[in-house]
């Protein structure tokens, strides 16, 4: 998708920027105030110095009274020093608020992902859209980041125009004396009209040329963002990725990466970006700068001729020239800001396309009973499901009922629908056909958070965060330390926990602390299991719970898991069929359907069944 500056009207441009500004003020109140104040001081302080300098030059060119000269010098020094001091203070404040704004902007994105339906979150189109937003911001700050710039430029431009107008009025009202001869022609209204037309032309043409340059850049947005992804993946991120470093060294992947970076050539000589810089963008900006120089030259001639004719003193020359050129520059700044905003509007549109993704999953109002007897009955009734955008059914006509407090194993080949079954049970997705019932009621009628509270899940691709061990187990800042410690011991983490000097306060990983500890894949899996145990939900679901454990640790977990689970209903997904023997019931999935269901002994007795084939396929590697 190519971004075009002319894609949105001025009304739409201002509307979407007002919305963006409201959102930024909501998540970071007062965030724009230092930018406004800094812009006012930045724009106004030069005019004070210009006016004082003109008075000083007038005195130097006439009476040259020492006490008057000293007064003007002191005023110039004092005003300049005060302005610089004030700007330094405001700049500090501005930098602090800028960092806060950038951080809160990330909070806005994170909150959206957390509130979004998992089905939309998992959708590739959503991920691609968010990646595009990221690349736009990385490229040139497009999106929210430019709001700070627009506030600054708008206030600076308006303040500058008002200040310049105040200092320029007398240029056109003061007349050249009749004794000046031919120079009295400067009093003719046509000169005034001509100067004003020139100012208007430069003021309008300059921003138009700058807008043309922005438009040229925006047409390259997709290519530039792709180039950023290439550089981020192969140049910036790879060297610090220790998990990939062994493969990179062993298979000389750096050569492949270097070749790809050179082949893509988004930013190199002869690339579209380089050509745009040399042609449309470069020429547009050069012409804009040339027009400004022409205006300055004409104004200098006009002001000097009026001064030569005696309309005002020599000190006013610098005042008027600076004021007129600054007036034009600030007006151009305002217009170019509008052009820039029209370009940025398309990038904000992408952001709000993401932020406005609606939650379509039905939110029920019933509460799940907090049953002390944990008597929860779950039934899949003719459930069928396919992932968004897919024509293939991931699950088809699944019927199953859980026996409360029992152990259920789910087995099957890769892609048979095992993990999809768990996602539907946890209501990460809703089925297209059929119903999932909790105690006879469709789970969609329950409050979502309430329903989620009855499940503890260890997904195969679980994540631990760089925080203390106890916080990882509890999932909160405040927690029951004895309960967290017991969960870790039950999960088989006792020996490693005893070896940690800080115990539950041990920071995991070194991303945020040099004192952090690294844990192996098996140890991380034990922590994830402990996290599920700590939640103490009626249902505990383990997706490949021992995949990263060695056989001894696996045997230890399974040997005591019946005791650990207690009266909970436990559901396991496993490729190691030896782990299924301790389960009360086994469901065999194949191509999205449940084709067998029974105990280990019952299923193994069916020599023509899928379970028997899977069992013997694995058993041959453990027997001679």
Can you say where each PLM-predicted feature lies in the sequence?
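Membrane-integrated ABC transporters
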Residues: 1-46, 66-72, 90-94, 123-162, ...
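Cytosolic ends of transmembrane helices, especially the final helix of ABC transmembrane type-1 domains
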Residues: 299, 318-357
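C-terminal portion of ABC ATPase nucleotide-binding domains
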Residues: 502-503, 559, 576-624
